[in-house]
């Protein structure tokens, strides 16, 4: 067994930064919670997903997403360059594998904000990851948030609500559930789950 410097002790496995996956239905506030947490604790590395979706107003390539064509996404998938990928509301999303593994090997806390399908893929390939489900305070509140965005046509909102029912039913598959009643409180709880504090 390797010796440790005097006055220190090895970091117990449960105290090391780890891969934390945040998932939950569309409109539950995942992006808002993550943005708040990272504003206070930028040391938590958030993976930037690749997507075939068109950018929303204010979104920047390489900051919010890597916006790619269908052909580029096909290549990423075929070459095994994605840790996980999923199709949602007619668009594909995926997490670049290399950047995540490099951060984890460096001992940095990594956070993925992904959908249910992606969370299941991560669970299969990296069972040590902590899966966190972000739940809405109520179904009515989730509907209000989705329709209040005003960025998508009604048929897309209907697809998102149908998917939300499936995602809410999968909550027991997760290691932890956080109810988004307060962005600040949920961000603090999520931070604790990344083993940063």
Curated annotation (Swiss-Prot):
Broad class of the protein's primary localization: cytoplasm
> Could you name the Gene Ontology cellular component terms for this entry?
cytosol
Under Pfam families, the record lists: Guanylate_kin
Q: Where does it reside?
A: Cytoplasm
Q: Which residues form the signal peptide?
A: none
On the tree of life, the source organism's domain of life is Bacteria
Q: Where is the Guanylate kinase-like domain?
A: 17-197
Which residues make up the binding site for ATP?
24-31
Which InterPro entries does this UniProt record tie to the protein? GK/Ca_channel_bsu, Guanylate_kin-like_dom, Guanylate_kinase, Guanylate_kinase_CS, P-loop_NTPase
The molecular function GO annotations come to: ATP binding; guanylate kinase activity
Cite the EC number: 2.7.4.8
What keywords is this UniProt entry annotated with?
ATP-binding, Cytoplasm, Kinase, Nucleotide-binding, Transferase
- List the HAMAP family: Guanylate_kinase
Task of the protein: Essential for recycling GMP and indirectly, cGMP.
Can you name this protein? Answer: Guanylate kinase
Whichever gene encodes this chain, its name is: gmk
């Amino acid at each position: 067994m390797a010796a440790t410097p005097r006055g220190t002790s090895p970091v117990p496995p449960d105290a090391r930064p780890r891969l934390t996956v945040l998932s939950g239905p569309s409109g539950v506030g995942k992006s808002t919670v993550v943005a708040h947490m990272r504003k206070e604790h930028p040391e938590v590395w958030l993976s930037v997903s690749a997507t075939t979706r068109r950018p929303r107003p204010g979104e920047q390539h390489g900051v919010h997403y890597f916006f790619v064509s269908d052909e580029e996404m096909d290549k990423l998938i075929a070459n095994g360059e994605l840790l996980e990928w999923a199709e949602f509301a007619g668009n594909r999303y995926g997490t670049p594998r290399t950047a995540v593994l490099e951060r984890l090997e460096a001992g940095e806390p990594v956070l993925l904000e992904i959908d249910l399908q992606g969370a299941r893929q991560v669970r299969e390939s990296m069972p040590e990851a902590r899966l966190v489900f972000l739940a809405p305070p109520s179904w009515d509140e989730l509907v209000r948030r989705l329709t209040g965005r005003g960025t998508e046509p009604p048929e897309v909102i209907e697809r998102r609500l149908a998917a939300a029912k499936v995602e809410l039913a999968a909550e027991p598959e997760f290691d932890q559930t956080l109810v988004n009643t307060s962005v600040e409180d949920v961000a603090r709880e999520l931070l604790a789950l990344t083993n940063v504090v």
